[in-house]
């Protein structure tokens, strides 16, 4: 089985590569790519085959690159490993010859924008922290960048203790109350009809480069039922 993973300098891609290397049941060939030359990023030395890719911002060139690699390597599955790639693949789903699994473009693009995603969740009566229109009577808040990955663009400030506030008052950011407590990430595996088949809550133990690096699987019926 030939599996392609792009943007392999990232933590997400490296984690996927390491997970695939542990699978003994199947003969898996990992094909990796990134904008760097081979040897300039660690991931390029961890895959079976490596290709230097054009920047994902060059959409037409990137799609042609994916199709060229698919033709040369007969790729069975492409695993998107970044938000930007997920948006691009869903946008050009009919032009990419390699098989991959993603939601439709409207859904992927919606959740790329954290403010729009939060507003949509509210419309569907899903409980999320409210959006602060002003900071009067607020205590501790979090400024969130609308389009960002990992924990980039996060600014947390205790208004009762801070002597000054960084200027994040512009349309690229929005503000919510800061919620104290543990962070639980929930992995959901669904079938083609969107019916959940496997739900795994994970309590974050360690964060690396803005993402959950170590987690503890927890059985919480309340979270699973949501």
What are these regions (language model features)?
Residues 1-101:
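ATP-binding N-terminal substructure of ATP-dependent carboxylate-amine bond-forming enzymes
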Residues 19-22, 190-193, 204:
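Short, solvent-exposed amphipathic alpha-helical segments in soluble enzyme
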Residues 41-42, 60-64, 109-115, 209-211:
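Short, charged, surface-exposed secondary-structure boundary motifs
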Residues 97, 105-183, 190-195, 221:
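Active-site nucleotide/adenylate-binding loops and adjacent lid/helix of ATP-dependent enzymes
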Residues 181, 205-206:
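A glycine-centered beta->alpha junction motif in the catalytic cores
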Residues 195-202, 208:
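Catalytic core of tubulin tyrosine ligase-like
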Residues 208-226:
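A long amphipathic alpha-helix within ATP-dependent nucleotide-binding catalytic cores
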